[in-house]
């Protein structure tokens, strides 16, 4: 078995090293990740300049002067000697739940695998800090091992959030849907040394829909959250109303 491992926190991130170590007994693991922290990079590709790939002498990890999506894209289309059986991303320093998934470089790295027909799993530690990173890596390895032994049909994309708790305090796995957040906090306006205004993006909004069955609810109650995602963003329930709206303008059949 072959696993391609990436992340969005960068190739020096503790979460990447811990997950790499945890996956080594399961498969042949190739690690390629961004050179710098790319949190919030989403599915961005670098098209305005060439990319370079270097290899860290101490870990053997490859790193790219680009985004998480760049990293997986380069690996799958320009470097891989053989097609991986699974793309894995993480472990992210912080949760990726609800609308986070649209911004997340961690989820994006996994999504790029799906774009090329490779099943993928993204892992995030639900609270920032590495207090229980070893426990999270153990959980991630268990999920990957179960997937490799019992693959899901098709080309699944799983978004996994793990509570930042000791292993024995975890209550198990729950398959969830995405919850929903309140809008993000306003930007933080400051002034630079030259007197010019600068802006920091504000914090993510608090949970709006954290009802039973959501990723937010699972994490709050000590469960590992596993959410199946898809690439198709079509709002199928809106198709009839949108067709009627277009026909009313006399511009649609």
UniProtKB/Swiss-Prot annotation:
Cofactor(s) listed: a divalent metal cation
Any one GO MF annotation of this record: nucleotide binding
Subcellular location(s) per record: Cytoplasm
Domain of life where this protein originates: Bacteria
Keyword presence, Cell membrane: no
Main location: cytoplasm
Family under the similarity heading: Belongs to the SurE nucleotidase family.
Protein name (Swiss-Prot/TrEMBL): 5'-nucleotidase SurE
Source organism per UniProt: Burkholderia vietnamiensis (strain G4 / LMG 22486)
Lineage, highest ranks first: Bacteria, Pseudomonadati, Pseudomonadota, Betaproteobacteria, Burkholderiales
């Amino acid at each position: 078995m072959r696993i391609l491992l990436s992340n969005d926190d960068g190739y020096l991130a503790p979460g990447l090293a811990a997950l790499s170590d945890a996956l080594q007994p399961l498969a042949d693991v190739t690690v390629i990740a961004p050179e710098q922290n790319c949190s919030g990079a989403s599915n961005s590709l670098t098209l305005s300049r060439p990319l370079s790939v270097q290899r860290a002498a101490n870990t053997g990890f490859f790193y790219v002067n680009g985004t998480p999506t760049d990293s997986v894209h380069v690996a799958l289309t320009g470097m891989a000697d053989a097609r991986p059986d699974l793309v894995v991303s993480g472990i992210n320093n912080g949760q990726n739940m609800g609308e986070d998934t649209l911004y997340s470089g961690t989820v994006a790295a996994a999504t790029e695998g799906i774009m090329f027909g490779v099943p993928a799993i993204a892992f995030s530690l639900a609270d920032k800090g590495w207090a229980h990173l070893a426990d999270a890596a153990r959980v991630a390895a268990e999920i990957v091992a179960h997937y490799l032994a019992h693959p899901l049909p098709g080309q699944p994309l799983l978004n996994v959030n793990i509570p930042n708790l000791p292993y024995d305090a975890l209550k198990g796995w729950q398959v969830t849907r995405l919850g929903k957040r309140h809008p993000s906090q306003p930007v933080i306006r400051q002034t630079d040394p030259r007197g010019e205004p600068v802006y920091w993006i504000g914090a993510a909004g608090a949970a709006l829909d954290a009802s039973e069955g959501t990723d937010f609810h699972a994490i709050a109650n000590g469960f590992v959250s596993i959410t199946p995602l898809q690439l198709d963003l079509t709002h199928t329930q809106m198709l009839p109303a949108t067709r009627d709206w277009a026909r009313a303008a006399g511009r649609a059949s």
